[in-house]
Amino acid sequence: MDDQIQRMKVLGAGIFSLMLALGVARFAYTPLLPLMQAQAGLGLAEGGWLAAINYAGYLTGALTAASISNLVLKDRLFRIGMVVAVLTTVMMGLTTDFWVWAVSRYLAGLASAASMLLGTGLILNWLIRHNHRSELGIHFAGIGLGIAGCSVAVAVMSLWLDWREQWFVFTAIACVLLVPALKWLPAPDTSTLTRTGAPMHDNPPSPLFMRVFMAAYFCAGVGFVVSATFIVAIVNRLPGLEGQGSWSFLAIGLAAVPACIVWDFIARRTGALNALILAAVLQIVGILLPVVVGGMVGAIAGALLFGGTFVGMVSLVLTMAG
């Protein structure tokens, strides 16, 4: 029983860290983007640059994380990243200076990599070491919960608060999420044995496979960052859908909550690589649907497909990487 309680606390730490770094620090920007354009003078081009800078921060963090094998260092950087996620959130509300926003978005990208990659790696290591199934479906529900929560929060807060005040509310939420994200994740065990005394195996794929794999993952990331950042603005500009973009973002979050559990199930039956290919194909369809089909049906269907695949792809990739 104690082991199951500890398992749920570890998974809870991962969920709260993803809600903090991805949901608040990263994705609160998406539903707030139209509001910042209307109230803070943020131009469409500048909004795009901020999204690109955020992805550059994530990419920098991802490359850095890939070069780190020391569990203690991973744990330290993860915890620093969670604090940075809170600081970057408050930075967005303190000014209307583009360059301060740019620094905030870059650091938020680093923080999201700390949660997505370092935090997930630490949790995966704990699960394997304690002889639990090395699947991350419950853990990655945090991304969907964060997206859906931010979407609802912005819709409600916009009735009373301006863009700046909403960033400050998100900062308060981030402070609350920070506590379990740090407290419930135990310090890493650096031994080479599992809890039962079995050796920890590391069987990485070939260098050629990893080069092709990372190139494909990079392309998927580019498509993801554009769609995830601008989905609200894109839907708002489609004929007949003015003001309806927030519903698409909410659909993405709701679809993302159970997505990894579903893809874990699919991967057990088809293999992780086949499941990843299927998810990529469905994500392409989801990105194109709002434009090709049009209307609210196309927007919501596309959002559900996108939300149901992008987190699953990350989970599958990290599970394959071990």
Across the structure, where does each feature detected by a protein language model lie?
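Extracytoplasmic gate region of multi-pass secondary transporters
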Residues: 30, 210-250
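Pair of pore-lining "gating" transmembrane helices in MFS-fold secondary transporters
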Residues: 7-28, 207-223, 304-308
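Helix-loop-helix hairpin linking two adjacent transmembrane segments in secondary transporters
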Residues: 134, 138-186
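Helix-to-loop junctions at the C-terminal end of transmembrane segments
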Residues: 61-73, 259-271
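C-terminal transmembrane helical hairpin of 12-TM major facilitator-type secondary transporters
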Residues: 273-317
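Paired small-residue
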Residues: 88, 99-107, 297-305
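Helix-breaking motifs and short loop linkers at transmembrane-helix boundaries and internal kinks
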Residues: 41, 73, 94-100, 293-294
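Cytoplasmic helix-loop-helix junction between adjacent transmembrane helices
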Residues: 104-142
